[in-house]
């Protein structure tokens, strides 16, 4: 009789690494964690460092750190100087030449934060894909998170790439983002852009749907215990439904005349509306990067120029945009030394 003894198959370094990364632990790491955790740590660290210590005097002529007297709303990691163009501003590159102080002064922390932040967001999206695959879920969480990634990449990376330099990207700070929004309105008439309109409809529509859905579920909870309220009389492992879809359907059928009768379609709609809005606004920002125009109602502008008694909300907004451009350009781009004579500043009923 012959006895065959099988040899255990040798496992390579990849298999050992795979086992270690996917081990069940309090904070899952996974392959996506190799991208997520270092990039997120470095992006947040750079942002906290910049807002605490680094000035924007050499890039924007501004104070932007806690050290200079700013608060949480006015501190920022500001975009690099216009003269830097689209350089990645490596610490060891020709601009900084290994000098950390000079690197901070010319805006190196901004490119560092933007690029590591983008890869951190992508790593978080891949993390959702990876965990969903391991536990047998569909990947719709990761698909939904593509919306915020698209917005971040289009606003912070693609828009300035279409313009003259990183200088025209938003700074990483609350007031800095507000300044960027005013810039988009004045120089691109962003609020009249159809992609902006779709983005607003998606985000506000998603908030409305979320509120309606949550309220409807709360309204139709089953009285399934002695204390049947929102926080009691429910166990996470129970097999029974905790609210009545039938009652909810009857309620909204009476309110609107139509209602969702399929939970899967209902929740897909809740997913689709805000994500579609985020993607639409991202596409619009890419259009702005290429300096594509929004709606132009030239006939109204011509008539308003000829007839002082004719004015529309559109012509008022056009005048306001001219004002933003004229008064903002000199403040926003001090390195250009803009000087506007009074006769070129906008005048009209809107101002």
Swiss-Prot record:
InterPro entries: D1/D2 (IPR055266), Photo_II_D1/D2_sf (IPR036854), Photo_RC_L/M (IPR000484), Photo_RC_L/M_CS (IPR055265), PSII_PsbD/D2 (IPR005868). One of its GO terms (biological process) is photosynthetic electron transport in photosystem II. The keyword Hydrolase does not apply. The chain crosses the membrane at residues 39-59, 123-139, 151-164, 206-226, 277-293. Chlorophyll a PD2 binds at residue 196. Keywords: Chlorophyll, Chloroplast, Chromophore, Electron transport, Iron, Magnesium, Membrane, Metal-binding, Oxidoreductase, Photosynthesis, Photosystem II, Plastid, Thylakoid, Transmembrane, Transmembrane helix, Transport. It comes from the Eukaryota. Fe cation binds at residues 213, 267. The keyword Ribonucleoprotein does not apply. One of its GO terms (cellular component) is photosystem II. Pfam families: Photo_RC (PF00124). PSII is composed of 1 copy each of membrane proteins PsbA, PsbB, PsbC, PsbD, PsbE, PsbF, PsbH, PsbI, PsbJ, PsbK, PsbL, PsbM, PsbT, PsbX, PsbY, PsbZ, Psb30/Ycf12, at least 3 peripheral proteins of the oxygen-evolving complex and a large number of cofactors. It forms dimeric complexes. Photosystem II (PSII) is a light-driven water:plastoquinone oxidoreductase that uses light energy to abstract electrons from H(2)O, generating O(2) and a proton gradient subsequently used for ATP formation. It consists of a core antenna complex that captures photons, and an electron transfer chain that converts photonic excitation into a charge separation. The D1/D2 (PsbA/PsbD) reaction center heterodimer binds P680, the primary electron donor of PSII as well as several subsequent electron acceptors. D2 is needed for assembly of a stable PSII complex. This is Photosystem II D2 protein. It comes from Cyanidioschyzon merolae (strain NIES-3377 / 10D) (Unicellular red alga).
